[in-house]
């Protein structure tokens, strides 16, 4: 399928919209009430610090809603205003945040049902309005919705679209796209649908396995077994790893994406020599600015003396998980929570350790003075961060009173 030609055709359709409906002022009040926070703004203006009682809160200098997320949510709100009575669907979570998605449900936006990992579009009819989320949608989904006569509202983040352009360029020049991402993540599924031949690698370890194979140090059967489900149909490692272009899921850890790119460049340089390197490797620059800013701010924050790190965001949010990884790598006690309600009752928190299921930690806050670092993923509203801070301060005050009584 010529994905470039399809996109051009779709973008010229009267039933396609990716710029909103000119109703920004109409929805501004609803967005502010639901997602913004005067407390968080005041903390920003106070050097990202709040002191109250025995607690000092230190906010990362970049956190929370990114521009792409703000844009997607605003367009979704505008869509409901523009189509007040029409049936509106969304192909997936608009962003990875439970409170934001709950607000869409309250606005009577329907989510495409998923049965055993497969989306069921059977209920979508001609004339329905369908929102594509910030992560994008696969080209096959877009084609289905277009052929069905739906009104498509595309909130795909422009940074994601930039990655799609990169893998289409790989395809045009007969390069295999090596995508650094999570194979089942919505963004990676969408990106791979625009690629030709592709291979998804999760981390530097998997990238090293691929590079070992390129240099003749691998077993074909073991390779295909390891990457089953992570390649394009008919992928042949003996044929398809001679010309490589690297791309990434925009929310992956910046430093690891860069390491993977350098690893493939060194490997192909070793395999084919400097004269022919450009015929076998394409450089890349698909790291999202917002992801990079939040990770850089997190690295700065964990350089400070902290007693505890609280990372806030959806449990299925890739960029939030990578922020948690940074704290863990520095040995700072840390918790990843998706909502204020995870804190309490009592001196306890329900949180998600890296790579594990939810667990309850009790006691949560230690006695004495505390410096607590806080950050949030790109899909987390300031209002949620405010709720977490309120709970932490209430818990700290209750603990202080209990200690004084004792």
UniProtKB/Swiss-Prot annotation:
Residues that bind [4Fe-4S] cluster: 66, 157, 288
Catalytic activity line of the entry: isopentenyl diphosphate + 2 oxidized [2Fe-2S]-[ferredoxin] + H2O = (2E)-4-hydroxy-3-methylbut-2-enyl diphosphate + 2 reduced [2Fe-2S]-[ferredoxin] + 2 H(+); dimethylallyl diphosphate + 2 oxidized [2Fe-2S]-[ferredoxin] + H2O = (2E)-4-hydroxy-3-methylbut-2-enyl diphosphate + 2 reduced [2Fe-2S]-[ferredoxin] + 2 H(+)
Keyword Metal-binding present in the record's keywords: the answer is yes
Please give the Gene Ontology molecular function terms for this protein: 4 iron, 4 sulfur cluster binding; 4-hydroxy-3-methylbut-2-enyl diphosphate reductase activity; metal ion binding
Which pathway does UniProt place it in? Isoprenoid biosynthesis; dimethylallyl diphosphate biosynthesis; dimethylallyl diphosphate from (2E)-4-hydroxy-3-methylbutenyl diphosphate: step 1/1; Isoprenoid biosynthesis; isopentenyl diphosphate biosynthesis via DXP pathway; isopentenyl diphosphate from 1-deoxy-D-xylulose 5-phosphate: step 6/6
Required cofactors, per record? [4Fe-4S] cluster
Give the residues the record marks as binding dimethylallyl diphosphate: 96, 185, 317-319, 379
Superkingdom is Bacteria
Asked whether the UniProt record includes 4Fe-4S among its keywords, one would answer yes
Q: Which PANTHER family match?
A: 4-HYDROXY-3-METHYLBUT-2-ENYL DIPHOSPHATE REDUCTASE, CHLOROPLASTIC
Stated name of the protein: 4-hydroxy-3-methylbut-2-enyl diphosphate reductase
**Native source organism of the sequence:** Synechococcus sp. (strain RCC307)
């Amino acid at each position: 399928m010529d994905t470039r030609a399809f996109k051009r055709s779709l973008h010229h359709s009267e039933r396609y919209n990716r710029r909103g409906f000119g109703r920004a002022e109409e929805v501004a009040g609803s967005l502010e009430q639901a997602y913004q926070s005067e407390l968080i703004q005041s903390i920003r203006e106070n050097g990202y610090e709040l002191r109250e009682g025995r607690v000092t809160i230190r906010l990362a200098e970049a956190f929370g809603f990114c521009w792409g997320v703000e844009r997607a949510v605003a367009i979704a709100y505008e869509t409901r205003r523009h189509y007040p009575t029409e049936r509106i669907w969304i192909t997936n979570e608009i962003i990875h945040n439970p409170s934001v998605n709950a607000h869409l449900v309250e606005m009577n936006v329907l989510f495409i049902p998923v049965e055993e990992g497969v989306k069921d579009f059977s209920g979508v009819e001609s004339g329905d309005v369908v929102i594509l989320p910030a992560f994008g949608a696969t080209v096959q989904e877009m084609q289905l919705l277009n052929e069905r006569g739906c009104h498509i509202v595309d909130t795909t983040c422009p940074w994601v679209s930039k990655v799609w352009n990169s893998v289409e360029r790989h395809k045009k020049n007969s390069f295999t796209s090596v995508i650094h991402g999570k194979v089942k993540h919505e963004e990676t599924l969408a990106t791979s649908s625009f690629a030709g031949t592709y291979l998804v690698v999760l981390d530097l370890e998997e990238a090293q396995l691929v590079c070992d194979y390129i240099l003749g140090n691998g077993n074909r059967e073991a390779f295909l077994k390891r990457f089953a489900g992570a390649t394009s149909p008919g992928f042949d490692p003996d044929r398809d790893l001679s010309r490589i272009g690297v791309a990434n899921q925009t929310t992956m850890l910046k430093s690891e994406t860069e390491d993977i790119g350098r690893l493939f460049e060194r490997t192909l340089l070793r395999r084919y020599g400097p004269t022919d390197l450009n015929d076998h490797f394409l450089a890349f620059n698909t790291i999202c600015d917002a992801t990079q800013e939040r990770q850089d701010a997190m690295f700065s924050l964990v350089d400070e003396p902290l007693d505890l790190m609280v990372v806030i965001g959806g449990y299925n949010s890739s960029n939030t998980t990578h922020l948690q990884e940074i704290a863990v790598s520095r040995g700072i006690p840390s918790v990843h929570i998706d909502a204020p309600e995870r804190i309490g009752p009592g001196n306890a928190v329900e949180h998600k350790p890296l790579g594990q299921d939810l667990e309850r930690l009790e006691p949560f806050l230690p006695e004495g003075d505390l410096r607590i670092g806080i950050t949030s993923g790109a899909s987390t509203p300031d209002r949620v961060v405010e709720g977490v801070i309120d709970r932490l301060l209430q818990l700290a005050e209750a603990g202080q009173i209990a200690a004084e009584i004792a």
